[in-house]
A protein has these predicted regions:
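Hydrophobic/aromatic residues located in beta-strands of well-ordered beta-sheets
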Residues: 59-61
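Glycine-rich, basic loop-to-helix element that forms the pyrophosphate-binding segment
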Residues: 90-114
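A conserved acidic beta->alpha catalytic loop
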Residues: 63-73, 91-93, 123
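N-proximal low-complexity "stem/linker" segments adjacent to membrane-targeting elements
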Residues: 1-48
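Short, conserved active-site loop motifs that form the nucleotide-linked donor/cofactor pocket
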Residues: 57, 82-85
Length: 133
């Protein structure tokens, strides 16, 4: 089975943005961030996306069975900001048994639920430079 089929079958909960505020005349860019641990890095990564000047950014947060502090932070961002979607996995999807398929599940679930015509992914410990989008 390929990673797309695995993603469709995986056990997750999708929470669409509470408030959507997109410019109808501009493309939506979705940035997917999957998170498990490293709250300090997660905060920097997420903030670098929220600080972009381009307003049609959908932030797709993936709680990959995250540690409690990371999970709480992601939920707070989801509730507080416009254009933020949240995907919650009950348990971490990573496995050394099949790294390529397991890692791709989170990313593909994000892609399957995204609104953007342009879709990107960054790791929890990466940051976007100013005006990247």
């Amino acid at each position: 089975m390929n990673a797309i089929e695995e993603a469709k079958k995986s056990n997750y909960k999708y929470l669409p943005p509470i408030v959507e505020n997109y410019e109808p005349s501009s493309q939506i860019i979705t940035v997917i961030v999957d998170c498990y641990y490293g709250l300090n890095y997660v905060q920097q990564s997420v903030q670098s996306i929220l600080d972009q000047d381009y307003r049609n950014v959908e932030l797709m947060l993936i709680d990959n069975g995250a540690e409690q502090d990371v999970s709480e932070y992601l939920h707070n961002i989801y509730v507080k900001w416009n254009n933020v979607a949240l995907i919650e996995f009950k348990e971490n999807q990573f496995s050394w048994d099949d790294i390529d398929i397991r890692v791709a599940i989170c990313w593909n679930v994000g892609v399957l639920n995204s609104k953007g015509s342009i879709i990107g992914h960054i790791n929890y410990d990466d940051m976007l430079s100013v005006n990247y989008c």
